[in-house]
Amino acid sequence: MTIADLTLSQLLPLSLTSTPSVSIQEDNKVWIAAGMLVHYLESFTDSLVVTDKKNMPIGLVGGIEIIKNIFENPSSDFFDKETVGNIVDEDLVRVSSDTNLRELLEKWQATHRAFSILPNSYGGYSAVSARKLLEVGANCKTDITISDLPYKEIISFQYDDTMGQIINSMMTNHTRKLVFKNSSSFISDRIIIQTIAQELNYLRDTENFLDMKFKEPFKLADIKSVSEDLNLAELSKLMFGMLHPYVMTREQVYTPWDVCMALLSDEISYDAY
């Protein structure tokens, strides 16, 4: 049996439900969701679970929902007048402790989103994210190294690019991070949302946001440089301990998503419980 055929309870017997999902009601304004996402994007929760008036999950709101709608409505009206229920992604993946890893990852591939919810013993839901699966990667046994992972082009941006160009590139290339050209720094949906919330007052005093050049108050984050010889378990352990997991070699960048997809390999063994 390969690692991909093991169930979530076999892979994470002690910690599967240890991360409660974070919820927000559908009638809350978007600025509330954006403020919450500043703290949760790229964490073990990563997205907000949207609930109805009966507190039942109806979908998700994450970084992509915010930046996509900013691109379409780059004004404070989006944050102050729009409700979370109007931008929710209703394609919510629900799993159980008996779901195997392959089934989970195939669902993530179909939705282009590494996030699921799982019922817990407290009557609520726990979050299962790409960040969570780094724990699985850290405990696997394999000779797979970073150099064995699929090649993907580094998507970059330049100093004179506008925020409109940057956000459009994220959406076009289905990525949440762009590398600053010829550097080891990056911008992400989290950084954009954090800047809008904390520095630009949810665009209440800002006009023509999409025409803003990349400059202050936007601040970049650093990518950690690693060797191509780093194996999958070591990479997982490294990312697991990072606040914002993102690493690069001379020619490639890698996120927890890449680790998750590598776990589908038949060349990985795992001591299941």
Give the location of each predicted region.
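Hydrophobic, helix-prone linear segments
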Residues: 1-61, 65-68
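Tandem CBS (Bateman) regulatory domains
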Residues: 2-20, 62-93, 105-109, 124-156, ...
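The conserved cystathionine-beta-synthase
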Residues: 22-45, 51, 93-113, 119-120, ...
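A structural signal for short beta-strand/turn segments enriched in small hydrophobics and glycine
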Residues: 55, 122-123
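Amphipathic alpha-helical protein-interaction segments
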Residues: 114-117, 126-128
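Short, structured interface segments that constitute the first stable element of a domain
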Residues: 174-192
